[in-house]
């Protein structure tokens, strides 16, 4: 009798312990389900976009809209982190980070691309672009010139997904640049590009290469007395504070390039690539639609400062400057040899194809 009682007690104890273990295991599973990320969240990818511009510029607007559209296309499975205002370094540093896989996208102008594929430098020749914004936009994104150059860029593990011209550039200066002769001896800040330097040597100026981040202080200290940039850049970077004149010239335009690495791009499947391209198209058109309002606002604020006089370049003087600037073509042709002549011919054909009839 005593033996049966002990057996029964032991059995009940074992059953109770087993039941406690089951309950504990169930509680642990519930706890872990809250502690660990969901399967969907664990698959979320983080992509970084970096650029050098400030709020109020077309580049900034494009990047923010691109973030919105990519995240929408991927239904929240991708998180886009945007690093504006040169937070991740210079254009060249960001481009290198893309090449080496530390950054998914960057939005530089064509200037840093020219350092590895010189043929892109044609975009920096003064007065070579159409005076019609959408002609340039279509020629860059649909024309044969950039397809041809893209094959060279891919050898450097880079791929341009979208070309987005900024608004046309103007000159800011401490002297009123109203005619060709005014450029003689002018200390103008330029991006450190062989072609851009050649542009101003053709005008008998004294081009002075200065990093973008140092332009304001260089103008303030008279290391340079002039520079070129779109109106919204002149405003957002406060260059007008240290310049007496802004001259509306429309002689060139910085061209933003949504750039990624071939390695990253090829890691995406076709459907994912199409999603990114759709997002880029929408973001570009959104940025373009807002450009006129931004330009007007920036111009009005510069005028309201009372510090800077806005001047227009007379059509006749623009023609004289354009003619004098053709001397810079020889530098491009010498630098790029046969490819240079081919690119210039292709670009002219693209402008004719997409130009206003």
Model-predicted segments: where are they?
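Short, low-complexity disordered leader/linker segments with a strong preference
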Residues: 1-46, 356-357
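N-terminal secretory/targeting leader peptides
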Residues: 41-136, 144, 151-357
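Short secondary-structure capping/junction motifs at helix and strand boundaries
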Residues: 18, 146-147
């Amino acid at each position: 009798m005593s033996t049966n009682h002990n057996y029964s007690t032991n059995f009940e104890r074992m059953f109770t312990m087993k039941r406690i273990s089951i309950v504990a295991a169930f509680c642990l599973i519930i706890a872990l389900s809250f502690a660990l990320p969901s399967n969907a969240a664990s698959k979320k990818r983080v992509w970084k976009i970096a650029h050098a511009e400030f709020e109020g510029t077309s580049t900034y607007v494009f990047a923010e809209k691109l973030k919105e559209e990519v995240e929408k296309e991927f239904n929240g499975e991708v998180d886009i982190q945007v690093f504006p205002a040169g937070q991740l370094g210079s254009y060249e540093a960001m481009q290198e980070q893309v090449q080496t896989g530390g950054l998914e996208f960057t939005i530089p102008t064509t200037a840093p691309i020219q350092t590895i594929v010189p043929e892109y430098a044609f975009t920096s020749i003064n007065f070579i672009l159409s005076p019609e914004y959408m002609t340039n936009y279509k020629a860059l994104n649909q024309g044969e010139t950039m397809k041809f150059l893209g094959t060279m860029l891919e050898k450097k593990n880079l791929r341009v997904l979208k070309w987005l011209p900024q608004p046309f550039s103007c000159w800011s200066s401490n002297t009123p640049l109203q005619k060709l002769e005014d450029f003689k001896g002018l200390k103008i800040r330029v991006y450190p590009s062989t072609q851009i330097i050649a542009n101003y040597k053709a005008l008998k100026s004294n081009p002075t290469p200065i990093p973008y981040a140092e332009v304001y202080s260089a103008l303030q200290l008279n290391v340079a007395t002039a520079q070129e940039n779109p109106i919204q850049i002149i405003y957002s970077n406060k260059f007008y504070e240290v310049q007496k004149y802004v001259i509306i010239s429309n002689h060139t335009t910085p061209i933003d390039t949504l750039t990624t690495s071939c390695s990253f791009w090829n890691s995406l499947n076709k459907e994912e690539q199409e999603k990114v391209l759709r997002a880029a198209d929408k973001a570009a058109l959104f940025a373009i639609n807002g450009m006129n309002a931004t330009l007007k606002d920036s111009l009005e604020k510069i005028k309201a400062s009372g510090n800077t006089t806005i001047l227009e370049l007379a059509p006749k003087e623009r023609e004289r400057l354009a003619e004098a600037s053709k001397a810079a073509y020889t530098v491009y042709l010498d630098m790029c040899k046969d490819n240079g002549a081919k690119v210039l011919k292709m670009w002219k054909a693209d402008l004719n194809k997409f130009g206003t009839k």
